Amino acid sequence: MARIAGVDLPREKRIEVALQYIYGIGKTTAQAICHRANVDVTTRTKDLTDDEVRRIRETIEQAVKVEGDLRREISLNIKRLMDLGCYRGLRHRKGLPVRGQRTHTNARTRKGPKKGLVRKAAAPAPK
């Protein structure tokens, strides 16, 4: 089993698909990595030679930010927006949609479950 960027790639899948198991690599990036490493995209992971795995690993290290580094960069970008106090940062801080979606209805995923309506206790009856 090939291990690239700290991820065990599935043995039976084509390398183009297996690379997509790495956070930060999608279909287009996987194809580009295979092309730059001179590896056929239809090759199964189990059929890769050690040299091909090494070339893929080096290509990823040079060209793409993946896994922990990418997650760290994204979280730092969000933290920077929140520290600036800009509109996008405020939306992140409040847990609301950031990209202009409506919130009067919908946006349940971002806002979380509904908060129930809290009613005041009935006043005691006059004597």
UniProtKB/Swiss-Prot annotation:
Q: Which SUPFAM superfamilies match?
A: S13-like H2TH domain
* Gene3D superfamilies hit by this protein: 1.10.8.50, 30s ribosomal protein s13, domain 2
* Alphabetical UniProt keywords: Ribonucleoprotein, Ribosomal protein, RNA-binding, rRNA-binding, tRNA-binding
Chain positions covered by the region annotation Disordered: 95-127
Cellular component, GO, one term: small ribosomal subunit
Protein's GO biological process: translation
GO-annotated molecular function: rRNA binding; structural constituent of ribosome; tRNA binding
Compositional bias of kind Basic residues: 95-118
Pfam families annotated for this entry?
Ribosomal_S13
| Disulfide-linked positions | none
Function, please?
A: Located at the top of the head of the 30S subunit, it contacts several helices of the 16S rRNA. In the 70S ribosome it contacts the 23S rRNA (bridge B1a) and protein L5 of the 50S subunit (bridge B1b), connecting the 2 subunits; these bridges are implicated in subunit movement. Contacts the tRNAs in the A and P-sites.
Family to which the UniProt record says this protein belongs: Belongs to the universal ribosomal protein uS13 family.
UniProt subunit comment? Part of the 30S ribosomal subunit. Forms a loose heterodimer with protein S19. Forms two bridges to the 50S subunit in the 70S ribosome.
**What's the protein name?**
Small ribosomal subunit protein uS13
